[in-house]
Amino acid sequence: MEQDKYLTVAAITKYIEKKFDVDPYMKQVFVRGEISNLKQPASGHLYFTVKDEFAMLRSVMFQKAVQKIGFVPEDGMNVLITGRIGVFTKAGRYQFYAEHMEPDGVGALYIQLEQLKTQLEKEGLFAETHKKVLPSFPSKVAVVTSKTGAAVRDILTTIHRRMPSVEVIVYPTIVQGEKSAQKIVENIGRINQRNDIDVMIIGRGGGSLEELWAFNEEPVVRAVYDSDVPVISAVGHETDFALSDFSADVRAATPTAAAELAVPDYRDLEERLAERKYRLLTVTRQLLERKERTLEQLKQHLILNGPKHQLEQQIERTDYFSERLKNAFSKQVLLKQTMFNRLNDRLHYYHPRKEIELQNEQLAVRKQALEKAMKRQLKDKQQVFVRQIEALEHLSPLALLKRGFGVTYKEGQLVKSVQDLEVGDDIQVKMQGGHIEASITAKEEDTSGN
């Protein structure tokens, strides 16, 4: 009976494991520390130690959890880890089973950004050989950005000023927040499903790294790279950069610069047309002058080598052949006159003046037609723009405020349900003409399910 009080190693280890499993404080543990002894075998699991200056904790992260982290862990990296404490019975030790990991500190996003940039650059997503040439004269431009930001106003204003005939199709999307990257990818896909879009602008106004982060997401960068429609990326201000800038066909410093790259200025085209017209007239005038000089040379040649001079020499030589020479001279004069008339007729026939006048008339008609078409299209686009502005004003949340509704915020976040509030919470209510601040003193939820 004395032997019954002794436990096996497996039994005591199992007992300790059960203690960890039932301890509520061990089921979800948040740990901050430095990674060391990092190993990743072919299985895809991560084995490492989390340490600080006083202790260390053996840890493991299984493959499914590893696939969900957005960066590559490295030795010496400070991290924040969520997981549970358990017992590895075969080794007889407790260890940390990590379920989520993210870099710790201000530079966390920069680390993730640089690692993703290096990965995509190795895959060739930023190669110059892949970039497409922007069309010289697009007729339709798609814009993927927020419908309420300054970026869309700058793009629309610039395009309509430079080339009023170009149709601009705006694909409104959220440009920051949890689902912003997904919405941007969806809109890029919709644009590529069409066959009439010549060039696409994606972007937003300036902001912090976190606010611009959607354009650093891997799905967005790959969607820009895979787009069959040429893409101009215009994210933030001139000093801001996003990974979509590198995978796009062209990077613009600002949304306004993107619009200038997308369409030419019709005034520049008019100047180029006028310049070509001037060059055509200059070449024609030079050709006419050369023909006139050639004609003068022919006249001088005819005077110096004409039959009259030959006849005078024959008369001085002998009177005997006077009559015969007169007859011969008359025949030769008639022949030369006929030839001269033929040459003169041919010269008039091939004279370029009539062709020049015809070309000038056609050029004037085409210019007049082009001006009428541009004015007509400008008027049509202005009418469409006015209707769109009226529709946007009708859908504006400010219209709801004018009808007596209010919008409630808690700590700067929109309150969508009474479940978002607790008794004692401070709230702000935006109403027509201003806002009020209040505190929740009572709460009653709607049990009807509405």
UniProtKB/Swiss-Prot annotation:
Subcellular locations according to the entry: Cytoplasm
GO molecular function: exodeoxyribonuclease VII activity; nucleic acid binding
Keywords assigned by UniProt, alphabetized: Cytoplasm, Exonuclease, Hydrolase, Nuclease
Catalytic activity line of the entry: Exonucleolytic cleavage in either 5'- to 3'- or 3'- to 5'-direction to yield nucleoside 5'-phosphates
InterPro entries noted in UniProt: Exonuc_VII_L (IPR003753), Exonuc_VII_lsu_C (IPR020579), OB-fold_nuc-bd_dom (IPR025824)
EC class of the enzyme, as a word: hydrolase
Family, similarity comment: Belongs to the XseA family.
Protein name: Exodeoxyribonuclease 7 large subunit
Organism: Listeria welshimeri serovar 6b (strain ATCC 35897 / DSM 20650 / CCUG 15529 / CIP 8149 / NCTC 11857 / SLCC 5334 / V8)
Gene: xseA
